[in-house]
Curated annotation (Swiss-Prot):
Catalysis performed (reactions): alpha-D-glucose 6-phosphate = beta-D-fructose 6-phosphate
Protein name per the record: Glucose-6-phosphate isomerase
Purpose of the protein: Catalyzes the reversible isomerization of glucose-6-phosphate to fructose-6-phosphate.
Annotated SUPFAM superfamilies: SIS domain (SSF53697)
Active site: 350 (proton donor), 381, 503
Any one GO BP annotation for this protein: glucose 6-phosphate metabolic process
Listed GO MF terms: carbohydrate derivative binding; glucose-6-phosphate isomerase activity; monosaccharide binding
Protein EC: 5.3.1.9
InterPro entries per UniProt: G6P_Isomerase, G6P_Isomerase_C, Phosphoglucose_isomerase_CS, SIS_dom_sf, SIS_PGI_1, SIS_PGI_2
Location in the cell: Cytoplasm
Sequence similarity: Belongs to the GPI family.
Predominant localisation class: cytoplasm
Organism: Burkholderia ambifaria (strain MC40-6)
Length: 540
C-alpha cells in the first residue's frame, strides 16, 4: 500500500483543509487556552531535552492523525529492525547500527568489537592528552588535524566546537575537508610539524578529497624535516579498509577501525570521533555516548504520542507534504552549536533526499526539505526579514540552551530573550489595524509595510545546559527523526547514491584538464567550454 492510499493520509488531507486557515494567535487567546494550556499539552520531554511544539499549526486531532500515520507506515517495526541489526539499508545489503556504538547492553550487536576499539581509542587519546605521545623531536602534541569529508568531518567538527568549554586547553583541533588547497594551507600556517598529529578519516581510504589532502600533508611533514621513518609519530588512520591505510604508509598499530554497518553521517560515535575524544577526553566522550543512548531509549520506549523523534519527524512531514514547505530552518541560539545546521544539512538531505521507494518505484510526493540555518542572533540580521514578512512559510526549529557554558553570563538573558521573542513574533504577527497604530497619524501608507502575517510555525527545543550528555541526546534526536520521516516516505535513509555520478564524471573532467586536447564529443558544449577555459588558465 502506497503512502497516498493509507487511511491516515486520506484523513490528514481532509483535516488539513479544515484547519489550514486556523490562526495560532486564536488558539493561544485567553478564552481558548484554558488549563491545561496549549503549551502544557504540547511540551514533550525526552532524553534530557524538552520540545515546545505549541507554536506549530497543529491541534490534538492533527497529532492523533499523524501518529496514526506513523503506525500505518510501520515506524515502530522499522525502528525495532534497526536496533536489532536487521538489514535496513537494502540497496547496500547492510544494517545501520550507529545505535550499537552507544549501547550499554552487552548483548547488543557487535558489543565486544565496539568496546575493544573504544578502549584502544581511549588509550591513545590519554597518551596524546598527557604528553606521553610525542612528535618525532620529543615535543608533546599541541595540534590535531582531522582530515576527512562529509561524515568524517561534519560530525567531529560540530561536536568539538560545541564542547570547546570542556576540551583540553593544551591541544588545538583543526579540520580540513575541502580539496581546495586553501583549506589545508590555512591550517598549516597555524601549526608546527613537531607538535602536530594528523588523523586521516576515510571509510575506503580512497576518497579523492581526503587522500589528496593527506598526501599533501605527508609531503609537508617531510619537507619540514620529519624523517619518513618517523611519520608514524604524526599520522593515524580511521578506516574500514586497514590494508589501504597501511599501503598509504601509516603504521598498522596506528589504524583505528570503523565498520560498513555505520554510515558516514552517523559515525561520530565510532573511531571517526577520535579527534573528539582527544579534545574532550575519554570520560566526556563516554558522556556524549550516554546522552545519545538516553535518546535511543526514549525513542524505543516512549509511546508515539509522547515520543520526541517521532513527533518532530511527523510535524516535518505535515509541513512538507501538506503545507508544501520547501525548506526548514534550524536556528540554535548558541554560538557553540554554530556547526549544527551544517551537520544537519548532511544528516537530513543526504539521508532523505531520495525519489525512489524501497520497492524501486518512484514517489509522487515531496521528500526531504532543504535544511539550512545559522546561530541566533546572527540570523536575525540576515534572513529573518524573509521569515517574518516574506510570502514563503519556513518552519523553524529554535534551540535554546538555558544556562551558559561561558563566563559572560550577563549576555545570556539577552540571547534567550531574542530566541523566545522571535518565536512569539512569528506566531502572533501584526495585523493591518495594529500596524496603523504603530505607524501613527498621517502615515497610513506605511502601515502595510509594518504588517506581519504571523502564523509562522516554530518548535523550540530546550536544553538545560550544553554538556556532552545533552549534546549526544540532541544529535540522536535528529538521527531518529530522519528515520521516522524515511519510513513514512518509504525510502532508504542509509544510502547516498546521489553523490556517485558526479564523482565518476569528475575523474573524466580531471583527466581532460591535463590532457593534450579534449574530445568535444565526450561532453556537452557547456562543459567542454568550461574545461577549455580552465585549461588555458591552468597553463598560465
Amino acid at each position: 500500500m502506497t503512502l497516498n492510499s493509507l487511511p491516515a493520509w486520506t484523513a490528514l488531507q481532509s483535516h488539513f483543509e479544515q484547519i489550514r486557515h486556523a490562526r495560532l494567535r486564536d488558539w493561544f487567546a485567553p478564552e481558548n487556552d484554558r488549563a491545561p494550556t496549549r503549551a502544557e499539552r504540547f511540551t514533550i520531554p525526552g532524553g534530557g531535552l524538552a520540545a515546545d511544539l505549541s507554536k506549530n499549526r497543529i491541534n490534538d486531532d492533527t497529532l492523533r492523525l499523524l501518529v496514526q500515520l506513523a503506525r500505518e507506515a510501520g515506524v515502530e517495526a522499522r525502528r525495532d529492525a534497526m536496533f536489532a541489526g536487521e538489514i535496513v539499508n537494502p540497496t547496500e545489503g547492510r544494517a545501520a547500527l550507529h545505535t550499537a556504538l552507544r549501547a550499554t547492553d552487552p548483548h547488543a550487536p557487535f558489543h565486544a568489537q565496539i568496546s575493544a576499539e573504544r578502549a584502544k581509542m581511549a588509550t591513545f587519546a590519554r597518551a596524546v592528552r598527557s604528553g606521553a605521545w610525542t612528535g618525532y623531536t620529543g615535543k608533546r602534541i599541541r595540534h590535531v588535524i582531522n582530515i576527512g569529508i562529509g561524515g568524517s568531518d561534519l560530525g567531529p567538527k560540530m561536536v568539538t566546537h560545541a564542547l570547546h568549554h570542556v576540551a583540553s586547553p593544551d591541544i588545538s583541533t583543526h579540520f580540513v575537508s575541502n580539496v581546495d588547497g586553501a583549506d589545508l594551507a590555512r591550517v598549516l600556517e597555524q601549526v608546527d610539524p613537531e607538535e602536530t598529529l594528523a588523523i586521516i578519516v576515510s571509510k575506503t581510504f580512497t576518497t579523492l578529497e581526503t587522500m589528496t589532502n593527506a598526501r599533501s600533508l605527508r609531503d609537508w611533514f617531510v619537507a619540514r624535516g620529519c624523517p619518513e621513518a618517523a611519520l608514524a609519530k604524526h599520522f593515524v588512520g580511521v578506516s574500514a579498509n586497514p590494508a589501504e591505510v597501511v599501503k598509504f604508509g601509516i603504521d598498522a598499530d596506528n589504524v583505528f577501525e570503523m565498520w560498513d554497518w555505520v554510515g558516514g553521517r552517523y559515525s561520530l560515535w565510532s573511531a571517526v570521533g577520535l579527534s573528539i575524544m582527544i579534545a574532550i577526553g575519554p570520560e566526556q566522550f563516554d558522556e556524549l555516548l550516554a546522552g545519545a543512548n538516553d535518546m535511543d531509549r526514549h525513542f524505543r520506549q516512549a509511546p508515539l504520542e509522547r515520543n520526541l523523534p517521532v513527533l518532530l519527524g511527523l510535524i516535518g512531514i505535515w509541513y512538507r507534504n501538506f503545507f508544501g514547505s520547501q525548506s526548514y530552518l534550524v536556528a540554535p541560539y548558541s554560538e557553540a552549536l554554530h556547526y549544527l545546521p551544517s551537520y544537519l544539512q548532511q544528516l537530513e538531505m543526504e539521508s532523505n533526499g531520495k525519489s525512489a521507494r524501497l520497492d524501486g518505484t518512484f514517489v509522487d510526493y515531496p521528500t526531504s526539505a532543504v535544511t539550512w540555518g545559522e546561530p541566533g542572533t546572527n540570523g536575525q540580521h540576515a534572513f529573518f526579514q524573509m521569515l517574518h514578512q516574506g510570502p514563503t512559510i519556513v518552519p523553524i526549529d529554535f534551540i535554546a540552551v538555558l544556562t551558559p557554558e561561558h563566563p559572560l553570563a550577563s549576555h545570556h538573558p539577552k540571547l534567550l530573550a531574542n530566541c523566545f521573542a522571535q518565536s512569539e513574533a512569528l506566531m502572533l504577527g501584526r495585523t493591518l489595524d495594529e500596524a496603523r497604530k504603530v505607524a501613527g497619524p498621517g502615515k497610513e501608507a506605511l502601515a502595510p509595510h509594518l504588517t506581519f502575517p504571523g502564523n509562522r510555525p516554530t518548535t523550540t527545543l530546550l536544553v538545560d545546559a550544553l554538556t556532552p550528555r545533552t549534546l549526544g541526546a540532541l544529535i540522536a534526536l535528529y538521527e531518529h527523526k530522519v528515520l521516522v520521516q524515511a519510513t513514512v516516505w518509504d525510502i532508504n535513509p542509509f544510502d547516498q547514491w546521489g553523490v556517485e555520478l558526479g564523482k565518476i564524471l569528475g575523474k573524466v573532467v580531471e583527466a581532460d584538464l591535463s590532457a593534450e586536447s579534449v574530445d568535444p564529443a565526450k561532453h556537452d558544449s557547456s562543459t567542454t567550454a568550461l574545461i577549455e577555459r580552465a585549461r588555458a588558465a591552468l597553463k598560465r
